[in-house]
Amino acid sequence: MAKAKFERTKPHVNIGTIGHVDHGKTTTTAAITLVLSKVGKASFKKYDEIDAAPEERERGITINTAHVEYETDNRHYAHVDCPGHADYIKNMITGAAQMDGAILVVSAADGPMPQTREHILLARQVGVPYIVVWLNKADMVDDPELMELVEMEVRELLSSYEFPGDDIPIVAGSGLKALECGCGKRECEWCGKIWALMDEVDKYIPTPERATDKPFLMPVEDVFTITGRGTVATGRVERGTIKVGEEVEIVGLAESTRKTVVTGVEMFRKLLDFAQAGDNIGTLLRGVERKDIERGQVLAKPGSIKPHTKFTAEVYVLSKEEGGRHTPFFNGYRPQFYFRTTDVTGFIELPEGVEMCMPGDNIKMTIELGKTIAIEEGLRFAIREGGRTVGAGVVTGIIE
């Protein structure tokens, strides 16, 4: 997945369109790029260009995703749109496209449908924190009372999944009419509605906390000893910053969490005073012996993450075509769970009344690991069998 560099003069936010098939997610995405292109803040992407999304592979799973980017006066946006329903599920579970917020597209003519519900549930489960609603196809509804009913229904549905349904902004319009008009003016009946939508997205979806502002965490990839100096753990800083002299905890795979002090930070063979999210570093750890630390543990800001063995997760099971299992698995299935840098054996408990899980399914399950791992809600993992990926999951709740 090539990530293009862009000029970072404005805060950056990742969003996406979600909602039921044929309610107009891609048309809406195209309309946003058209309207913003009129003021030089986007390049117009036609429906067909977005719909013919390239295949990407994320953790061995094939996902079709279209990426468009555009700006408003206040922000730079990266926007994902998926052609197929299954692509959304895979995207949200693998975190291939992390969303800081989503535009939920609901056809005003049809109201909420099964996939509307499923996408809201997934957004809740995988931690998409904010939703703005676009009631599309408003040109097909003449009765204002009907519009009000659909709006009420959407608000109730959002509230039932613990989103603040009463406060969520809802904008009604028509992506198709905005595309047909194409003037891009704020005072236009249809293009103006796209502006109203983007104004709400700007206002309602907060700028995410930057990775560097979060508590320090570095998954340990490798460990070695430097004679006369001590033990060095290497890895890529996932979030936060670390300064020489700061205290960290070594979390996971051990009976207890131990504290140590980082006495040196090195990157590209140069000594640094500090490192931040994204840096590949070596950390020299005071008083830690080679046997006290291993790949699969994390170095973290004390108290910021705990070791756990049991949790709930939302999981996508790879289909046979994706190189997954050819047969279903049952309660008590014991694969490997790959967290950050290592595999840990564990077993799966399926929900009550569910006998088995078929390749291609997505399912909520409880997982118990044989060893502790530094786990928190929102952490992504892979399920593997003999070294090949058979599933992808995200932690939705900690049990113990």
Curated annotation (Swiss-Prot):
Membrane-crossing segments per the record: none
Region G5: start-end pairs: 174-176
Binding-site positions, GTP: 19-26, 81-85, 136-139
Region (G2): 60-64
Ranges where the record places region G1: 19-26
GO molecular function: GTP binding; GTPase activity; translation elongation factor activity
Binding of Mg(2+), residues: 26
GO cellular component: cytosol
Pfam families: GTP_EFTU (PF00009), GTP_EFTU_D2 (PF03144), GTP_EFTU_D3 (PF03143)
Region annotated G3, chain positions: 81-84
Reactions accelerated catalytically: GTP + H2O = GDP + phosphate + H(+)
Top-level taxon of the source organism: Bacteria
Localization annotation: Cytoplasm
EC number assigned by the record: 3.6.5.3
Free-text function comment from the UniProt entry: GTP hydrolase that promotes the GTP-dependent binding of aminoacyl-tRNA to the A-site of ribosomes during protein biosynthesis.
Family: Belongs to the TRAFAC class translation factor GTPase superfamily. Classic translation factor GTPase family. EF-Tu/EF-1A subfamily.
Protein's recorded name: Elongation factor Tu
Originating organism: Heliobacterium modesticaldum (strain ATCC 51547 / Ice1)
Gene: tuf
